[in-house]
C-alpha cells in the first residue's frame, strides 16, 4: 500500500497549494485556538474549498463538543475528523456515530504504558495516529516537535491503519517508517520556520523524503 502523507496545520493558501502540488494525501486544518496553527471557520471554509478533492481534508479538534464539531463539519466539509484531545473511546464512538465521518484518534506516546488504551480506541476509530505525548502542563497536545521512541511500535499488531507523527523531518522520516511499519506519516512543526509558519520548500522536501522512504523498503 502506498504510504499516506499528511501535512497538518496548514493555514495559508500558498502552503496549502505547495502541499497539494507536492502530492500530499491528506491536509490538516487545526480548529483549536490554543494552537499557533489555528484557523477560524471562515478561513477553514476558504482552504477547504481550495482543496477540493485533491487530497483528503482532515479537521483537527481537541475535546470539542458536538456544537463545535457540527460547525466545523458544516464549514470545512472534512473527509476525516482527527480527535487530538483526551476523548475517551466511548466519546470517539459517539462522535463517529453522530456525525457519520471516519475518525482518526491520536494517542500520545512516551512509554509502553501509553499503549494500554490502544485496544479500546482501535475498536471504535477508523485510524490511529501515534504522536509524542505532550509534557505535563503543555498548552496543546501536539505540534511540539518532540519525538517518541519508535521502537515501542515495532511489530505492532493492529487491524486498522495507523500513522506516526511527532518530531518528523525529511531527515528522519525513513527511519520512522522502517522501525514502526506505519502506513502513514503526519508532519506539522517539521515543515515550519516558526510555530505556525509553514515553509513550501520544507513541505516539498518532506514529501519527497517520505515517498523515497517507501521505495527503500520495496
Curated annotation (Swiss-Prot):
Identification of the protein by name: N-(5'-phosphoribosyl)anthranilate isomerase
InterPro entries xref list: Aldolase_TIM, PRAI_dom, RibuloseP-bd_barrel, TrpF_fam
Family: Belongs to the TrpF family.
GO biological process annotation, one example: L-tryptophan biosynthetic process
Catalytic activity field: N-(5-phospho-beta-D-ribosyl)anthranilate = 1-(2-carboxyphenylamino)-1-deoxy-D-ribulose 5-phosphate
PANTHER family, alphabetized: N-(5'-PHOSPHORIBOSYL)ANTHRANILATE ISOMERASE
Alphabetized GO MF terms: phosphoribosylanthranilate isomerase activity
UniProt cross-references to Gene3D superfamilies, sorted A to Z: Aldolase class I
Domain of life: Bacteria
Keyword Isomerase assigned: yes
Gene responsible for this protein: trpF
Pfam families: PRAI
Pathway: Amino-acid biosynthesis; L-tryptophan biosynthesis; L-tryptophan from chorismate: step 3/5
Species this chain originates from: Rhodopseudomonas palustris (strain BisB18)
High-level lineage: Bacteria, Pseudomonadati, Pseudomonadota, Alphaproteobacteria, Hyphomicrobiales
